[in-house]
């Protein structure tokens, strides 16, 4: 039974990167949701569902620290964005994230990773996790940029 008297904290993280590439090139990389060589400290990723893309796809990401995060795709808009929820593996009660892309007037692609999350951890732990998540997004997006622009 859940204790509804526990203090909860909600927060968000948002980071973006500009990539010199076509919409098609960036989407091709982002839409391969188990090919995550650009994801910071990712060890391996595999499908847990028969479905391999689109809403209802489930993946399991294993990290170098031994943690595993199960994610379910809940939105899929080709060449625009996808959203997912984390079911297990994070110190959170809820986590929803979207990775989106948009062509800018300069012809570059702006990739944005943003999330909303809720925790019942102590405020200090929650704030530390929020900072960690922002750094994780920044590093991963820089890896994505380097990966795309050098290939």
Q: What are the language-model segments listed below?
A:
Residues 13-15, 57-59, 71, 97, ...:
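Hydrophobic residues positioned within well-ordered beta-strands of beta-sheet architectures
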């Amino acid at each position: 039974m859940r204790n509804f008297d526990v203090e909860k904290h909600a927060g968000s993280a948002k980071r973006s990167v500009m990539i010199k590439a076509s919409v098609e090139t960036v989407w091709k990389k982002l839409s391969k949701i188990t090919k995550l060589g650009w994801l910071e400290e990712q060890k391996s990723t595999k499908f847990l569902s028969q479905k391999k893309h689109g809403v209802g796809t489930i993946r399991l990401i294993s990290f170098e620290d031994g943690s595993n995060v199960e994610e379910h795709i809940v939105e899929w808009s080709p060449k625009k964005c996808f959203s997912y929820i984390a079911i297990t593996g994070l110190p959170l009660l809820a986590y929803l994230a979207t990775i989106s892309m948009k062509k800018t007037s300069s012809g570059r692609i702006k990739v944005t990773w943003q999330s909303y999350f809720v925790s019942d951890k102590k405020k200090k732990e929650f704030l530390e996790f929020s900072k960690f998540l922002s750094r994780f997004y920044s590093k991963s997006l820089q890896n994505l940029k380097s990966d795309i622009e050098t290939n």
